[in-house]
């Protein structure tokens, strides 16, 4: 890892904060073609693309309930118990996020209020590839269930032996209503437009590769999406009292995701910087995903030595990381200095994987600096708000002149007339 020193501005310039757009012109062109084919050919396009991209010849898209039950029966009880414990924690945290309707009748003859309604149908994308992510199923599905979404449709690409049984078991535990064995940009297109087998949804959530991310960007507006996620990120803030072995392990926990993952340590201690570097080298040797983690650390990893604790927070807030660990003495004292971070881990024993799997807060987080204006996935992402008003004639009479004046100043005479006509019989 490269060690950086200097002023805040020099460090930020050296860091050259990358905003990963997770797309390219070539990919965008390919994705548009895929979406159009799914839009016109429906299920047949999904069969063709699954054969082409996944090397799997399908005869049906929906995973039968019997297959889901059989997959769950194969899973070791200890894993199912761990999954159940995680589910309880995720549900207990997200249940506190529920928004509430309100009714305001403070003014005579006036009723105003807000309704909160769940989305009808949500599509959840679960990646395939070299790793299975049952935790991603829980994190995307459970907030939707708590919000009251009636129909949750999951898609995931099949492998040679079908869908990973741990993913299926997680989907059953979370309460997914339908599962389809299709992935990629063609799967996103199916959720956005609907096919003979797959329903059109109101919103698509879940992570994926560059094709999935680009497809989500393309269909946004036809349906809602959660966010466009880039490679995983972690920033660790550490003082001289931090444990270098803990820091190194947490940095590597993100580096093993992807060669484009970003792992950054910001510290006021040169000793901690050097010892963490040594720990990373040592721990890398025993990692099964060493090649990925090492490439990430070498090309995207950074150690920044700041002059003061305040500088540490200034740099971190500009980075706006997906994951932030505060390994400082009395970490709670610094909570309100954090302006921009997706998920925050306070203290040496609040390790980032605790949030990935178990503690309860969501692990679907803004990346690439977007924590400056985006939030983690939550219950509110699966609801919508509607306002309502009711006025008596007497209440409207008190306010009609002001309304007419505003409408006429905007040149919208029909708006003004709509108010005036209700009182014309009195003149």
Curated annotation (Swiss-Prot):
Q: Catalytic residues?
A: 322 (proton acceptor), 323 (proton acceptor)
Q: Kindly report, in one word, the top-level EC class recorded for this enzyme.
A: oxidoreductase
Q: Which domain of life is it from?
A: Bacteria
Q: Give the required cofactors.
A: Zn(2+)
Look up the record and report any one GO term of the cellular component aspect. cytosol
Q: Where does Zn(2+) bind?
A: 254, 257, 356, 415
InterPro entries in the cross-refs: Ald_DH/histidinol_DH, Histidinol_DH_CS, Histidinol_DH_monofunct, Hstdl_DH
**What pathway, per the record?**
Amino-acid biosynthesis; L-histidine biosynthesis; L-histidine from 5-phospho-alpha-D-ribose 1-diphosphate: step 9/9
Could you give a single Gene Ontology term from the biological process aspect?
L-histidine biosynthetic process
Keyword Amino-acid biosynthesis assigned to the entry: answer is: yes
Recite the UniProt keywords alphabetically: Amino-acid biosynthesis, Histidine biosynthesis, Metal-binding, NAD, Oxidoreductase, Zinc
EC number per UniProt = 1.1.1.23
Catalytic reaction equation(s): L-histidinol + 2 NAD(+) + H2O = L-histidine + 2 NADH + 3 H(+)
Any one Gene Ontology MF annotation carried by this entry is: zinc ion binding
Q: What positions does the entry give for substrate binding?
A: 232, 254, 257, 323, 356, 410, 415
Q: What does the note under cofactor report?
A: Binds 1 zinc ion per subunit.
Q: Entry's NCBIfam families?
A: hisD
Per the entry, what this protein does is: Catalyzes the sequential NAD-dependent oxidations of L-histidinol to L-histidinaldehyde and then to L-histidine.
User: Which protein family is it in?
Assistant: Belongs to the histidinol dehydrogenase family.
| Record-given protein name | Histidinol dehydrogenase
> What organism does the record attribute this protein to?
Listeria monocytogenes serotype 4b (strain F2365)
């Amino acid at each position: 890892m490269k060690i950086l020193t200097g002023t805040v501005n020099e460090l930020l310039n050296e860091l050259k904060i990358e905003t990963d757009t997770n797309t390219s012109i070539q990919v965008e062109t390919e994705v548009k073609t895929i979406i159009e084919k799914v839009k016109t050919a429906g299920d047949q396009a999904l069969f063709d693309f699954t054969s082409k991209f996944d090397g799997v010849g399908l005869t049906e898209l929906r995973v039968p309930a019997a297959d889901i039950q059989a997959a769950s029966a194969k899973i070791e009880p200890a894993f199912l118990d761990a999954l159940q414990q995680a589910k309880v924690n995720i549900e207990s945290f997200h249940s506190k996020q529920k928004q509430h309707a309100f009714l305001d009748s403070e003014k005579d003859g006036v009723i105003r209020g807000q309704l909160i309604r769940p989305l009808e149908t949500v599509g959840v994308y679960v990646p395939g590839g070299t790793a299975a992510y049952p935790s991603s199923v829980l994190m995307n599905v459970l907030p939707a269930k708590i919000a009251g979404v009636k129909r949750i449709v999951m898609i995931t690409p099949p492998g040679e032996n079908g869908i990973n049984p741990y993913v299926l078991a997680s989907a059953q535990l979370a309460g997914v209503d339908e599962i389809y064995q299709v992935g990629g940009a063609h799967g996103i297109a199916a959720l956005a437009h609907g096919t003979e087998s797959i329903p059109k949804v109101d919103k698509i959530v879940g992570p994926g590769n560059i094709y999935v991310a680009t497809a989500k960007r393309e269909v946004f507006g036809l349906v809602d999406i959660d966010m466009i996620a880039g490679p995983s990120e972690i920033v660790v803030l550490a003082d001289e009292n931090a444990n270098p072995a803990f820091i190194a392990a947490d940095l590597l926990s993100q580096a093993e995701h992807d060669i484009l993952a970003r792992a950054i340590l910001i510290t006021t201690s040169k000793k901690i910087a050097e010892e963490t570097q040594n720990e990373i080298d040592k721990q890398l040797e025993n990692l099964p995903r060493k090649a990925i983690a090492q490439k990430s650390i070498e090309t995207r990893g950074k150690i920044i030595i700041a002059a003061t604790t305040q500088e540490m927070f200034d740099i971190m807030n500009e980075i706006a990381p997906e994951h932030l660990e505060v390994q400082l003495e009395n970490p709670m004292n610094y909570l309100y200095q954090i302006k921009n971070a997706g998920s925050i881990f306070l203290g040496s024993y609040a390790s980032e994987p605790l949030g990935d799997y178990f503690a309860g807060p969501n692990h679907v987080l803004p990346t690439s600096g977007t924590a400056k204006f985006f939030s983690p996935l939550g219950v509110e992402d699966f609801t919508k708000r509607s306002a309502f008003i009711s006025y008596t004639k007497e209440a409207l009479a008190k306010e009609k002149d002001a309304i007419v004046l505003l409408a006429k100043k905007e040149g919208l005479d029909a708006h003004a007339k709509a108010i005036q006509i209700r009182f014309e019989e009195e003149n």
